[in-house]
Amino acid sequence: MVIIMEKPWVEKYRPKTLDDIVGQDEIVKRLKKYVEKKSMPHLLFSGPPGVGKCLTGDTKVIVNGEIREIGEVIEEISNGKFGVTLTNNLKVLGIDEDGKIREFDVQYVYKDKTNTLIKIKTKMGRELKVTTYHPLLINHKNGEIKWEKAENLKVGDKLATPRYILFNESDYNEELAEWLGYFIGDGHADKESNKITFTNGDEKLRKRFAELTEKLFKDAKIKERIHKDRTPDIYVNSKEAVEFIDKLGLRGKKADKVRIPKEIMRSDALRAFLRAYFDCDGGIEKHSIVLSTASKEMAEDLVYALLRFGIIAKLREKVNKNNNKVYYHIVISNSSNLRTFLDNIGFSQERKLKKLLEIIKDENPNLDVITIDKEKIRYIRDRLKVKLTRDIEKDNWSYNKCRKITQELLKEIYYRLEELKEIEKALEENILIDWDEVAERRKEIAEKTGIRSDRILEYIRGKRKPSLKNYIKIANTLGKNIEKIIDAMRIFAKKYSSYAEIGKMLNMWNSSIKIYLESNTQEIEKLEEIRKTELKLVKEILNDEKLIDSIGYVLFLASNEIYWDEIVEIEQLNGEFTIYDLHVPRYHNFIGGNLPTILHNTTAALCLARDLFGENWRDNFLELNASVSKDTPILVKIDGKVKRTTFEELDKIYFETNDENEMYKKVDNLEVLTVDENFRVRWRKVSTIIRHKVDKILRIKFEGGYIELTGNHSIMMLDENGLVAKKASDIKVGDCFLSFVANIEGEKDRLDLKEFEPKDITSRVKIINDFDIDEDTAWMLGLYVAEGAVGFKGKTSGQVIYTLGSHEHDLINKLNDIVDKKGFSKYENFTGSGFDRKRLSAKQIRILNTQLARFVEENFYDGNGRRARNKRIPDIIFELKENLRVEFLKGLADGDSSGNWREVVRISSKSDNLLIDTVWLARISGIESSIFENEARLIWKGGMKWKKSNLLPAEPIIKMIKKLENKINGNWRYILRHQLYEGKKRVSKDKIKQILEMVNVEKLSDKEKEVYDLLKKLSKTELYALVVKEIEIIDYNDFVYDVSVPNNEMFFAGNVPILLHNSDERGIDVIRTKVKDFARTKPIGDVPFKIIFLDESDALTADAQNALRRTMEKYSDVCRFILSCLTGDAKITLPDEREIKIEDFIKMFEERKLKHVLNRNGEDLVLAGVKFNSKIVNHKVYRLVLESGREIEATGDHKFLTRDGWKEVYELKEDDEVLVYPALEGVGFEVDERRIIGLNEFYEFLTNYEIKLGYKPLGKAKSYKELITRDKEKILSRVLELSDKYSKSEIRRKIEEEFGIKISLTTIKNLINGKIDGFALKYVRKIKELGWDEITYDDEKAGIFARLLGFIIGDGHLSKSKEGRILITATINELEGIKKDLEKLGIKASNIIEKDIEHKLDGREIKGKTSFIYINNKAFYLLLNFWGVEIGNKTINGYNIPKWIKYGNKFVKREFLRGLFGADGTKPYIKKYNINGIKLGIRVENISKDKTLEFFEEVKKMLEEFEVESYIKVSKIDNKNLTELIVKANNKNYLKYLSRISYAYEKDNFARLVGEYLRIKEAYKDIILKEIAENALKEADGEKSLRELARKYNVPVDFIINQLKGKDIGLPRNFMTFEEFLKEKVVDGKYVSERIIKKECIGYRDVYDITCHKDPSFIANGFVSHNCNYPSKIIPPIQSRCAVFRFSPLKKEDIAKKLKEIAEKEGLNLTESGLEAIIYVSEGDMRKAINVLQTAAALSDVIDDEIVYKVSSRARPEEVKKMMELALDGKFMEARDLLYKLMVEWGMSGEDILNQMFREINSLDIDERKKVELADAIGETDFRIVEGANERIQLSALLAKMALMGR
């Protein structure tokens, strides 16, 4: 069975982001009212995951099988209350994951208010009024199916509606229903009397009505009346009938008020009712059935009723011109609908029936259609190579056609997937055989295969390679079906891949792959490589999420029951509206509307407060937490005592069992096992235990155990960088978990049994209060677990009873010896065995000691009885010394196991707890152990050839080793051959050690050293790998748990210990200090709520954020998340200076196509992106316009860089200045996946180059060595064909005969092994190695190549040397920039060389210096030549623009031009206001004049693409042609050139500043002066003088005069010069400080922001913009709740003020010395300060410095400083004594002392250099201590070093 859909489609396409699901403005408005009334204080801002998506009260919905208005239903349930009301007896209809109609339970209902609605009308007559953010399931015009907010809908979109609906059917009299149909259609009941009339012109219908009336109503008097001037009728007088009509509310009812009675709507009698009603009021018009009614309710009921039979009807309104009344027409059209009506309802009237049959024709394909997402269908076609019909090209498919096509397609898909599964299964097995086994069975194999024995020996020794046929024969004999694998490989290559694809991955030629797969090849290793590659490709297909998604789409199309109704009208309504919604868990939709429509339910207010939800308040939000199940085993220390327990038992110890709302419990006496930095198992303290409830969990089974946990609890795994956390939901079968086998230290060797001492002690009673445990007694206690029992006579006289088989002499003797040695009284007897009580086959040894018996009873059982199933290993045993724990296990194994000690021991027990205890005890005692059903297995570490505990995951280890590959002296691949070539998933630590011994450590780089150190740690680790076997989801519905392990985040748990990631440490701590404690206190003043500021929310983990969310829901009154962002049209600059709108960047960032931007640091990594509407955070958007004309729109709290630092838009005013970076513009980022290098064309070029070098083709070459590469490949192909049939010498002869060349035997041997050389092949491989063949036009490297190419054409030279040298002459600054570009491409250049030069120019002698670099890179050299760069003198050979540039995108063209002008272009010249001189000049010989002109024409065309005008000028100088391309001299043209192209390298920065000056100058003329001129002309007629106007507008008087004369606006004389611009405006040489000339508020907008890694900034529209503080890393539920303000660190006085306030309230005497001490130890952290104060207060009411330093385990700073000064003065012994005092008396750790020493460095009276040395020494010591070195020794060594250092 192939599982296609991972989750419901309806769920998949529901809104997933906060922006999609929240309408915060209205909800917040209402919640504020609640807070003002103080009735629901916890509702404000601590809202649930989503709010809002609602409907108006008149929306119809089917609830409990009845059509009702949603408002009426919810008002009944909520009693008019706004907000959330729980319900458990409501059912509605909705669609499931396959688009099928089902009935669902409603969990709660919701009522609210809003000011805005969207009214939607559809083609079929549907009319919906929903909130703007209500999602509706839509089929877009592009074929996409998704939930879309109402405000985003467009006319032409298709709305999902059901094809049929379900009701809970009830019994109803069919004849009575028919009678009602007639009555409602053409009947009338008099209001005052018992008269009923039925008026109809059809005699048969009248007769039928009369028959039914007579039958149904016994008192009926019936009379038919025929009238002359009106329609005949049936007159009925019946009290019973009228009373029946009256009950239904139909008596005297007008035609516009009638409805279908609800009892009939839900019964099977509905068809009889409809037939009768359509007989009366229905008819045939054109090609449709039409029924007209004056009742809108009846019309809508009819549409619902018809859907019960799958009949889709249209509702149409018409105004009757005679009476001006609105009538509602039900229209049934389309043949399939008409046929369904005929089959299920039909007409009784023959005339109508006949007409109906006449209009049923072939289906109209243009009706009832769905728009197809052709991209998904095509993706399936391309990925699975499925053949499709031509229908795929059509945009719209009819419903029936769609189902037919997709069902056929699914059959083909399933077949292909099954075939791929079979191929995968076949390819999982490697094709390599064990030649050692072949050697052992050589004779047998020779007999069975017919291959000579000596030939097989040659194969074994590697002297000859077997052909594939012979290899298969040998493999078959060994029981290995390789033929099946090869067949699978061939099928996959031909059917699902290609030789080209496989060849590309293996860096082989297509022809080689074909030869290996299709011929009788000898290259079995190559086949194995192909197998592994194909297996990887198969797995990629089967795990392709896009493919799975596309198949899910097809499955949805094939099985859905949706009719897509086109939207024809959308209107926004404004006013006050009450809105309603229902919550349907999991599927989140229901059917409702005036005509049935699929509606999304809200996820609003899931858990606004516990009092609203009762016991279910957590159900919908706590499932996000990561936790393990209650019965998960764990080994802990409580108050220093070891205990093997479960989380459920910890719950009983730490939580109040009667308060389920208590979710966190801070603990200070709990420790768990975890791992340290060296991967060693250690005890670590727990800070908090967390619990919450969930419905479902995962059970993951692995080798020897299982673990139960929530889907997003993280499990620690190993990757190439070390330990990483991976969510349980992402774990796959075959992954490796980490467990441990370690020797955990134990100290106990004595038991204190005093508490078990008998009360009445006599001389005969042996008292053993201190019970020494040696190896014998440990063994005895272990044996008790296996074979012991305890018995008492009364409350005294206890016995410890051992029952052993009478044949177990060794055990009996050993036990007797131990009992005697310990001096216990004993009694022996024989007894019956458990199998035969009569047969005395067992011996009992009874130790007669009540004290020991009481101890055993209390500690060896679980408290639920003393049977075998209740046995446990006592907690005290876990604390014993290691040798004693091992002896205990031996005793247990000797009594109750099979197998041999020191090998595999199987211990059986009925007690699950005992087995788990055994596994944990073994693992902390250095013994590998596993758990199975009723059995624990121990694998002792001695004497075993294999142990799982010595194994680690192979994949990450191999990745690490590959990073060291070049520094390994030896064949490490042979050592790991089973992992590399046979797919073994694990590798032993011994092999890692073996490889590490081969590493040349001295030659390792810093990064390689890190990898080496990591491998070294892993080779010695106590961790090892266990493979995941099975994963399942199980029902749970109970508490799950987690623990927080500060500064470690890991712990071991499980029935077999697995390393888990703890999830909540950071969150718990932050919540307690930042939110929880703050929220607990009452608000001050009249406002009944407070604001919570979260100053570190962007650093919280996801789990911490969830914890924050829970606490907010429980305590907080107000929490809004404040973000600062830009509007979507802001263009941000990428590192290569392409532009992209920020909204487009975020889309590409999410798709991982872009991840870097340009900011103050240069290139920076983007960590996160966010989008939302600024109304959500209550920040309006402002537009800023600068004096250069640059504009940007940003929220009021967004920051921009100014000379004075970052400033918010709110702070900025007109005439303030912001900094601008003149980034290039005009080249947008566009996806362009064309490759810049065509390998086929390059190979062709290399072939021609080979011929120039003297290589020859077949026919001209005399020997193989002379051949061009292409013909060598032909020889290779032929050699491989012959290799299976002939010897090497025979092959040589045939090749020489066939091709007429000489070839050596060595060459033949190499060719048989697939080895081929050749000039062309060599450089194609080099291009691939460098990755240049993968570079696409949208890649930054394409721009680098283009830029270098332009510069080299200008100032570069390709020499004629054999090595392929490239010379580039330029300034030193330019060369440094060029070298950086070359490095990015993997090209190494020489150092920069400077030389003195002398030459003549125009008759003048010129002396100076020149600088250049050379590049010896033949691949780059050949590539440049391939692109058209001439070798030798360009002035003779001419210039070319490479085709890939000429036909490339604007990006590569711009970079080419920048390089070209950077080399040969003139730098812009500017003086005062004017600029000129941008041109490109080249001197060439006459021979290349025309070619150069062509080149310049091409450059001119390129410039035109950037709207830059230029012209070409040719002149003669010294018999050479100076060809110039001159940029036309006007400011606007220059500005276009400088802002869109500029120069590469050194000239670039100056050119940008010139460009920005021009921009300001032109904007001043076009914007500012224009406005001044207009205002001046208006005011010139007034009283003001011309001089006053000039002063007012800061312009010369003649400017005003010129405007009055009507002259063109010119630049006034007082405008700043360029020199003034550089002095006054330029900041840091690259930024321009520009004045804001306009600031305006433009309201709320959709806004965007990004977060960068190194620097909180990015360039947008030239502005230096501040990014947000990681808002997108905050989970949506937090974003929907919080207002985050970033705070700077607290000042000392602020902390002091707060501490004094607290001390006063708590009645404490806080001394000045105590206050200073708290400030010192808290390091500016208020949380720490308050905690220290509270801890100190527990010891004394007087808080002085002594008590502060005591409770915080800190030394006085003066003592630390004194110790450091003593050391620096050379008084080492005194300094060391003080150090020991700090460690012993103050209890300080080495890390604490180092931290304080580091803080004191600045206060020491030593020079700066000594301070640097001291900081370095402290850092080195800290590292050594962290790595596990002895603290005292390291700190003493540090003091010694300081003594030597001196002052």
UniProtKB/Swiss-Prot annotation:
Looking up PROSITE patterns in the UniProt record yields:
INTEIN_C_TER, INTEIN_ENDONUCLEASE, INTEIN_N_TER
A Gene Ontology molecular function term for this protein is: DNA binding
Query: According to the lineage, what is the superkingdom?
Result: Archaea
Q: Which residues form a coiled coil?
A: none
What InterPro entries is this protein classified in? Cro/C1-type_HTH (IPR001387), DNA_pol3_clamp-load_cplx_C (IPR008921), DNA_Rep/Repair_Clamp_Loader (IPR050238), Hint_dom_C (IPR003586), Hint_dom_N (IPR003587), Hint_dom_sf (IPR036844), Homing_endonucl (IPR027434), INTEIN (IPR006142)
Q: Enumerate the SUPFAM superfamilies for this protein.
A: Hedgehog/intein (Hint) domain (SSF51294), Homing endonucleases (SSF55608), lambda repressor-like DNA-binding domains (SSF47413), P-loop containing nucleoside triphosphate hydrolases (SSF52540), post-AAA+ oligomerization domain-like (SSF48019)
A Gene Ontology biological process noted in the UniProt record is: intein-mediated protein splicing
Q: How is it modified after translation?
A: This protein undergoes a protein self splicing that involves a post-translational excision of the intervening region (intein) followed by peptide ligation.
Q: What else is known?
A: The intein interrupts the potential ATP-binding site.
Please state which protein family the record places this protein in.
Answer: Belongs to the activator 1 small subunits family. RfcS subfamily.
- Summarize the protein's role: Part of the RFC clamp loader complex which loads the PCNA sliding clamp onto DNA.
Please give the name of this protein.
Replication factor C small subunit
Organism name: Methanocaldococcus jannaschii (strain ATCC 43067 / DSM 2661 / JAL-1 / JCM 10045 / NBRC 100440)
